[in-house]
């Protein structure tokens, strides 16, 4: 995988550890949030959907979508005064909540791989009530 054998060995250890952690977390019913540290790297940020879709190895599409939405919101609310979303609930679609929504061309509950290609499959992207993409016809 890598030219440097040490890097390959390290990568394999991380991969093996990741497999064990996700399996054990699911067995124990641990709430898992989805996130990355790719905030300031556009190339890495673009890969987040692919990373999310890879979770199908351990979770159902429903569990993956819940993890990335309402469970993330629930766990974020635990950060107390550091919570940037104090004006309304997040992770839900209801009156007074932050209006963050994705509309996907297809059913990600049947095919979670749809989230791996947002440029093609996300037909509407809304963040805090502002529409950033709308290709609905």
Regions found by a protein language model. Name each.
Residues 3-5, 14-108:
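His/Asp/Glu-enriched, well-ordered alpha-helical/loop segment
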Residues 81-82, 114-116:
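Short loop/turn motifs at secondary-structure junctions and domain boundaries
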Residues 85-86, 118-120:
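Short, small/polar residue-rich loop motifs at catalytic or cofactor-binding pockets
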Residues 128-129:
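Glycine-centered positions in the ABC transporter ATPase nucleotide-binding domain
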Residues 108-114:
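Short, Lys/Arg- and Gly-enriched loop/turn segments at beta-strand edges
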Residues 125:
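Short aromatic-centered micro-motifs
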